[in-house]
A protein has these predicted regions:
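Glycine-rich phosphate-binding loops that contact phosphosugars or nucleotide phosphates
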Residues: 26-136
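A short, well-structured juxtamembrane/interface segment
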Residues: 4-24
Length: 136
């Protein structure tokens, strides 16, 4: 069962990668609230250290929505995270990014949630407190 979930997540990430490769991405924005934002810091860290081809930044979802980055547009990739998929600020930020032409992806644990309806690529991850490391 866990292998199927991992395979789905890998396929979703691969689809996002293929889409990103067809665009001239210049900016990557990592967007969420609270703990969901904190879980994206490894992505921010790796991109910041491993590439100088794109500008990478982390923005709180409410701030992103109320004061959108000037560089946000069709050369942007916006990576969001909402565990529930319903965090209002994150859903609003996703909608804004999508409307501005950015490629959007959101991590969530809830298929069919509100954030899925406003992003290009939902990516499901599975939060199982009883068995948090299913492949170990």
């Amino acid at each position: 069962m866990h292998e199927e979930k991992v395979a789905l997540t890998k396929n979703q990430i691969a689809a996002l990668r293929r889409a990103a490769e067809t665009r001239s991405i210049q900016d990557i924005f990592v967007v969420a609230c609270g703990g969901s934002l904190a879980t994206l810091y490894p992505i921010l860290y790796i991109l910041d250290r491993e590439t100088n081809a794109v500008h990478v930044s982390s923005v709180n979802a409410a701030e992103f929505f109320h004061n959108p980055p000037h560089r946000l547009g069709d050369h942007s990739l916006v990576i969001l995270n909402s565990q529930s998929g319903t965090t209002p600020e994150t859903v609003s930020a996703a909608r804004l990014a999508h409307e501005r032409g950015a490629l959007t992806a959101a991590f969530t644990t809830v298929p069919g949630s509100a954030i899925e309806t406003v992003v290009d690529f939902p990516i499901y991850y599975y939060d199982d407190p009883i068995n948090p490391y299913p492949l170990l």
